[in-house]
């Protein structure tokens, strides 16, 4: 049986980080019902899509460096390092790209709420594909969204310029296992 971070009132982020399984686990680490709820991740690979949420979120970087890329009008890129706090506005697509290992706590509302995984063309910037979902355990929906994107060349082909993109890289991401564990605990 694999261990994972437990929900508790106090938290040693760095000790709990050692219990994470892969990038973007987003394990809830506060007692159920705490809102906003802190979710812990240790990220080593670029997020495979832009995440769009219906609610505002806050991202706290505890260790490592990276960047948050926004698909706003200016295509803003925000560099993050230890101690940085980034505001992630609702309905603005954002993607985390670590430079090495990046430990982060995401403060988000309690699910379920609507989220979406979105992919944009590297050539022209057009939206290529978007999957919207509402789930108590969004990690399972993330996994299914990437699996669908990777299995359909049409979803990876830009409707504006015709450029076909490679499959989304998952690296050490294990959202399917995280979802199974969280569903098994009622988290």
Located regions from the model:
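Short metal-coordination and nucleic-acid-contact micro-motifs, chiefly zinc-binding Cys/His arrays
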Residues: 115-120, 151-154
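Conserved metal-binding segment of the jelly-roll/cupin
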Residues: 80-100
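A short hydrophobic beta-strand segment most commonly corresponding to one strand
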Residues: 99-118
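Cys/His-coordinated zinc-binding microdomains
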Residues: 122-126, 159-162
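Structural motif
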Residues: 65-67, 101-103, 127
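Short, non-ligating residues that shape and space the ligands of small metal-coordination modules
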Residues: 130-133, 167-168
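A short beta-strand-loop-beta hairpin characteristic of the jelly-roll/cupin
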Residues: 52-84
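A short, N-terminal "cap"/entry segment at the start of jelly-roll beta-barrel domains
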Residues: 1-42, 46-50, 146-159, 163-187
């Amino acid at each position: 049986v694999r261990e994972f971070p437990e929900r508790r009132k106090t938290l040693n982020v760095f000790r709990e980080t050692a219990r994470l399984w892969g990038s973007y686990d987003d394990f809830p680490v506060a007692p159920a019902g705490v809102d906003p709820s802190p979710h812990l991740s240790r990220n080593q690979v670029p997020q495979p899509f832009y995440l769009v949420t219906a609610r505002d979120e806050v991202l706290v970087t505890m260790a490592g460096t990276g960047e948050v890329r926004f698909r706003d009008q200016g295509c803003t890129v925000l560099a993050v390092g230890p101690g940085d706090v980034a505001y992630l506005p609702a309905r603005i697509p954002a993607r985390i790209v670590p430079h090495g290992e990046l430990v982060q706590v995401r403060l988000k509302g309690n699910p379920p709420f609507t989220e979406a995984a979105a992919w944009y063309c590297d050539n022209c910037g057009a939206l290529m594909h978007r999957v919207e979902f509402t789930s108590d355990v969004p990690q399972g929906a993330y996994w299914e969204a990437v699996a669908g994107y990777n299995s359909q060349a049409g979803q990876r082909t830009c409707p504006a310029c015709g450029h076909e993109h490679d499959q989304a890289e998952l690296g050490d991401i294990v959202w399917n296992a995280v979802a199974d564990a969280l569903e098994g605990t009622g988290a």
